[in-house]
C-alpha cells in the first residue's frame, strides 16, 4: 500500500476529499498527523495510570505495587496485540478489553464496570494533557 505524506492540514483534507468518493473507508494515523505528544515515549503515560490503579486497589484493601500492575498491563496488552495480529495487520489492542482484563486481575471479585470507566477517564485525561495540535510545517 502506498502512503502519502502531507505537510499541512489543508493539503491532507484536500487529498482526503479527493480520494473519499472512491473509498468506503479512509484511515490515517491521528498521532503525528494532527496531534503530537509532548513526551518522547507515549508509554510514559501508562505509569501514572498504574499508580492510580494501585491507589484505587489500596482503598479496597488490595496491596499491589504500581510496578506489578504495570508489568501485568504490559503482558496483557502484549497478548491482546498478539491475538489481533493473527487476524489484522495493525497489531492494535482494544483498550476496554485489555484494561478490563487487567482490572479483573487486580481487583478480582471486587471488579465492576465503574472501575473500568474511572480508569479510562483518568487515562484519557492523562493522554489529553500530553497532546498538542500539530502546526503546519
Model features per residue range: what roles?
Residues 128-135:
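Catalytic cores of eukaryotic secretory-pathway lumenal/extracellular enzymes that build
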Residues 36, 86-90, 128:
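Generic amphipathic alpha-helical segments used as scaffolds and interaction surfaces in large
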Residues 13-71:
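Active-site neighborhood of HAD-like aspartate-dependent phosphohydrolases
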Residues 1-18:
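Generic start-of-chain signal for non-secretory N-termini
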Residues 45, 49-122:
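A metal-dependent, Asp-based hydrolase signature
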Residues 12, 136-137:
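Well-ordered alpha-helical segments embedded in enzymatic catalytic cores
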Amino acid at each position: 500500500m502506498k502512503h502519502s505524506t502531507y505537510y499541512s492540514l489543508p493539503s491532507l483534507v484536500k487529498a482526503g476529499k479527493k480520494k473519499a468518493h472512491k473509498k468506503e473507508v479512509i484511515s490515517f494515523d491521528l498521532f503525528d498527523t494532527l496531534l503530537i505528544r509532548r513526551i518522547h515515549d507515549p508509554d510514559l503515560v501508562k505509569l501514572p495510570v498504574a499508580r492510580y490503579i494501585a491507589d484505587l486497589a489500596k482503598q479496597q484493601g488490595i496491596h499491589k505495587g504500581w510496578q506489578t500492575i504495570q508489568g501485568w498491563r504490559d503482558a496483557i496488552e502484549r497478548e491482546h496485540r498478539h491475538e489481533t495480529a493473527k487476524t489484522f495487520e495493525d497489531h492494535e489492542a482494544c483498550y476496554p478489553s485489555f484494561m478490563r482484563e487487567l482490572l479483573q486481575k487486580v481487583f478480582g471479585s471486587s471488579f465492576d464496570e465503574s472501575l473500568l470507566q474511572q480508569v479510562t477517564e483518568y487515562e484519557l485525561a492523562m493522554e489529553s494533557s500530553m497532546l498538542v495540535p500539530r502546526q503546519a510545517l
